[in-house]
Structures are given as C-alpha cells and as structure tokens.
Amino acid sequence: QHSFEADPSVLFFSTHQYPHYPGTGRATECGTGAGEGFTINVPMEAGEGDDDYRAVFQKVLVPAADAFKPELVIISAGFDAHRDDPLASMGLTEEGYADLTSIVAGIATRHCRGRLLSSLEGGYNLTALAASVARRARPEGIRKLRA
C-alpha cells in the first residue's frame, strides 16, 4: 500500500480483516498527494465470507477499475481469509476465491486484453490453501465472468 500511495498510475485495492496486524488498511487510508483516491481499502469484519466479499468486489472494485482502465492487473492473493485458516477470522471458501478471481479476470479482459498476474501472498492452513489455489485456477471458473 505505502509503495504506491502517492502514485496515480497505480490503483491499489485491498480487502482485509480489520482491525488486524499490522494495523494499516483503514478505509481513510486512500493515498496521498497525486495518488489520493487511488488507494482503496475495504476493511472487513471478522466472519465475513463469500457473499460479503463478492458484494465488495462488485460494488467497489469493479466501478473503480472500470474508471481507472488498468493496463495490467496484479492479484496478490492472500488465502489467510479462508474460513479454515488459523491466522485470520474470515469466512471465504474455495468457491469464494474462485468467484473473486473471476471478477478480477473480467476486469483484465475488459481493460487490458486479459493481462493478469497472480501471486501467492498468505495462507497458513495448507489443506485450505491447496484447495483454494486449485479451485481458482480452473479455467471454467475464470471463464465464468469473463464472457
């Protein structure tokens, strides 16, 4: 977040349990200087799950990305929001991760010819992590919202 907070050429979007370590990511943290408004933090309450995340992605991320028109989309995928992960207290499932990936893939398809990079960030229940990564990588899941 802080790497790009003053950069209007990067749209940074984050959903995360709040309050939680490291204590950043308040909704009021929205960038600085020329980058103000290009950082979007959506704090989530403990226990929120698939429907809550889908709603935030559809109501907040999609309109922001459509206005921004990215040339490349990068996902830093934190799987510690999985309902079985010991680090956080969120309620995402494998299907939820697949749906969120499809939403983001749709943004990449509309604005940057599908240029999408995804990296693994977190996830500490290895069974849930493996299942979530495998589920979101299935082509039918990505095609679902790209069409």
Please tell me what each predicted stretch does:
Residues 1-147:
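A general "terminal functional-core" signal
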